[in-house]
Amino acid sequence: MAIIVKGEITISKGFNHWKEMIFSQKEKMAEIGMQLLFAGTTKEDPTKLISIIKFDSVEAMQAFGSDKEFTETRRQAGMVMESGVMTPISDEFLTNFPEPFIQH
């Protein structure tokens, strides 16, 4: 069963640096079983990154959390790991209504 999570974390090297790291980790994310549905910084604070992540399963979410190499890659990209908060979303949600908005 898929799990959707809202993530909030501080980034110290800017969104574009973070985005380059994410693009370079496409294979790792597929291996773990995760998909980034949304990510962006808040207008008031460009160091506050908000993300919506879909994990294929509880095991995929656990694999993400325990992957030391991926954690270090994210840390090197400016993610302040100690500031991270992940909040599971309930099974009641709506996406892409009335149509998807996509920007890379």
Predicted stretch roles:
Residues M1-T71, Q76, V80-H104:
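Short S/T/G/P-rich N-terminal loop/turn motif that feeds into the first structured element of a domain
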